[in-house]
């Protein structure tokens, strides 16, 4: 598909709709066709200058290609257009995390999740930063909120179990690990952590 020709062709009415062009850009970005994605986002921004979506998309592909400064500019433009963009806050959080500004990343991930508790990128980013900072209570809350909406997500369940274990909430961690193994009996990480916790509990009981 010649994206440039299609985008510039006035006879292609469907390519003159913001939603179509924006979604096409997201599709290209998801498969790593960044130049085609960029052209779509530029067209989408021209069609709807006040929409944040094209700038969020541009920020994502700039970040994927290692152009951190350009990504940050794009995410900040998105936030000027829409201060409630969860994805833009998550994008700035990822940049802060990559550049070692953990406190700033933590706050930006929290803001992203306040706006959309279903944002898995922000949730896992907050998990990583929380582990680096040793701050667990807020990410535990958002992991629980996410699991209320996605109760069978074993990857998030394991993140929550690991944090509970580190935070001294051993009973809840064990319950989560057993739930994971009932859903995925071959989940090696969950099995190993459960064995470690059961061994720890047995040692404590012996004392």
Regions found by a protein language model. Name each.
Residues 2-5, 31-43, 65-77, 98-111, ...:
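Structural signature of tandem alpha-helical TPR/SEL1-like repeats
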